[in-house]
Amino acid sequence: MKKIVTLFVAIAAFCGFTSKAEEATTFEVNRIKYTVTGENSVGVSGLNENYEPSEVKLTEVIIPSTVENAGKNYTVTSVEEYAFRWTSGILKIELPNTVTELKNNAIYYNDDLEEIVLSENITKLGEYSLASNRKLKSLAIPAGVTEIPQSCFASDEGLTSITFASDFTSIGNGAFYKAGMAEITIPGSCKTIGNNAFQLCPNLSKVTLGEGVETLNEGAFRECAKLTEINLPASLKTIGQYAFLNDVMLSSVRIPVGVT
């Protein structure tokens, strides 16, 4: 009986320790929630949108490079999954240059968001990490990003301008599905454009592919109703099925020699 009681006390103590440890991994500073991700690092994990009647509703969120909790300083290095989702009234989000990664769905489906200032040091964007922000107007992708992942900018219908760095290598499936830009220039460092990457972009009229692009996968530019001009480089090797399906305004495309 004594052994059973001792074991019970040990388990209870362990559970209590675990609970306290879990509580300590997340904290809030100035309405912004953070999750500890390393010994000295945190990720932005949410926004407290519960306001007292006397408080002013946030319209801009400016993330600091460091935050303090329980007497310890942490560097903000990431934006976690669903950190900013379904917000209302937030017009601008600005990230510090200490942030290197946006996780999947990090800044997703925000009704009023018009501007995102990305860290210059971001190297990784997650799937859907900047998707469905329908009022987002423009964005510059930092030089350290080498891959545009699946559905990263999908349904950003208000996006009129996007600037690529000169050294990224691929655009993922559905990356710009239903995005709003009218023209796009893809540098030659990008070797592969994924399935349905630009499908149903309603305003897209002109596409310039830099010398070096090698593969357009299935449905890459399908159902772009206003597309009238696309330049295919001599470096192109493969065009997938339905790459230009139902591009009703595209009267002709010059296919480079050797394309399969």
Predicted regions and their residues:
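Sec/Tat signal peptide C-region and signal peptidase I cleavage site
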Residues: 17-22
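Acidic/polar N-terminal loop/beta-strand segments that form early-domain functional surfaces
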Residues: 47, 64-66, 82, 105
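Structural signature of tandem-repeat unit edges
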Residues: 39, 55-78, 88-101, 111-124, ...
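Bacterial N-terminal signal peptides
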Residues: 6-15
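GGW-centered surface loops in extracellular recognition modules
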Residues: 24-52
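Positively charged n-region of N-terminal signal peptides that target proteins for export
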Residues: 1-4
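Consensus positions within tandem repeat domains that build extended binding/scaffold surfaces
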Residues: 80-83, 103-108, 126-129, 149-152, ...
